[in-house]
Amino acid sequence: MKKKCFKKTVSWALSIVMSATMAVTPVLADTFTDGSQLIVSEDAGEETPAAAISDAEDEGMMEPEHTFEIEDNCEDSGRTGFSSENEASGFSDGSVLAAQTEEKAAVYLDPSSGNDDNTGKSATSAVKTLSKAVELAQGGDIFLLGRVEVDSDIKLSNVTFRPGKSNMSGMLYISRGKVTLENIIINNKTPDGKSCQFSNYPIEVTGRLATLTIADGTEIGPFPGNSCIIVSHDSTVNLNGGKILGDKQNTVEYGGGIYAEHATVNVNGGTISGHSATYGGGIFSSYSNIKINGGTISDNQSIRGSGIYAINDSNVSLKGGSIIHNKSGQGAGVYLSISKLFINGESCQITQNTVTTEPSPKDMRGEGGGIYLIYSEAEIESGTINKNTAIAAAPDENGNIQGGLGGAISAKYSRVTIKGDTKIRNNSAGNRGGAIYTEGTNNDSSLLNIEGGTISGNHVNGSGAGIFAICSRGNKHNMDVNISGGTITNNY
């Protein structure tokens, strides 16, 4: 009789116990030719859905699975054959093939009172340094009992950082050096599975010598009630991959994913999603430079600026990536106040974002489905602004309609230039400006320059399917529209 046997010689004098282990690895119409312009005469009282300019009253603003290779027939020698399945198998001598799972280590790190001579196996035997904790963890969990300061170049890989207690000031404080996180998980779950309350930001990057790079496989968040990362004082955060996650349930005031002040944020890949904030669901920027070259900012919500909220002389540059499926009251994709926006990337997309007036038009203005600007400038040379929506509220008792302004862009007291091969298409508004709504006043002028691009397939339930321009108070010359190129067609 012949049975299967292993290639390698096995000593049958010994009872054999085989243990299979598994490693766990942790895991942002009408065509206008050059020189032409369609402007409605106020005296004639005519209006065209493609472009309208009028005066109006003021409006409310495992490791791989190990299998044992079995082959070759051999003579029966009284040995009992066994399989490579992960189960107990009997031998003729009564020994057992056992399958076992080895759990990864959990290490406690206390930067204040820990000692690297300790085992790190409990809070009372915590180690002191990050390097020792990483060494002992071997890809497992590191429970932080205090905020860890990083002030030198370091690359962290294949571990999970969790709070070791229910109240902490923060988790990582990066004051200098280049810090890279690869296949890192940082979350809010304490050893007993509850959430930690932070008095400061979970991750803080500060100072001009500090750079945090988030690479593939990294997951940061959620941190309910906190921004995930603050970057300040001329420091830099690079999101090259991974995820910065929110839970959509707990609202922070500023910047659910990243809060940037006097800093630089480069998004080259990865995802920022699921955040809820009053201002800036994905990214909040004040006096900062935000550069989006790739990645995705999606499924965030806020009152203003669900994707990006930029104020105070911030510069926002979009050369790639997607800002998609965000929901807000104003500027669901991008919101700018006293700031500048540059869009110049064929692959850049601002799409399927929605502004609404719910639950209250007082806060949720329903303006700028893709982009909202106030006292700001935008230069759009390429990219696509597509399928964004500005929803209007139902008319009040006096018949006035709130919101529904600018399906793609709403610009107040701002300067907007559209040129190149920009595509603004298939956007919709519930009141005015299916594609673009722009407004000036007696004291605050607005300027819309259309030098190129295509505005097509946009829809409005009210006026100005392509463009609606208005001077809401005073001198109508404070609202200028210059069309010297491009195509405006099939808007309805």
Q: For each of these PLM feature ranges, what is it?
A:
Residues 1-6, 41-43:
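N-terminal secretory signal peptides that target proteins for export/translocation
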Residues 7-28:
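Sec-dependent N-terminal signal peptides of Gram-positive bacterial secreted proteins and lipoproteins
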Residues 31, 35-45, 59-60, 65-131:
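Right-handed parallel beta-helix/beta-solenoid
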Residues 139, 150-157, 172-190, 201-224, ...:
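Surface-exposed loop/turn motifs in large extracellular/passenger domains
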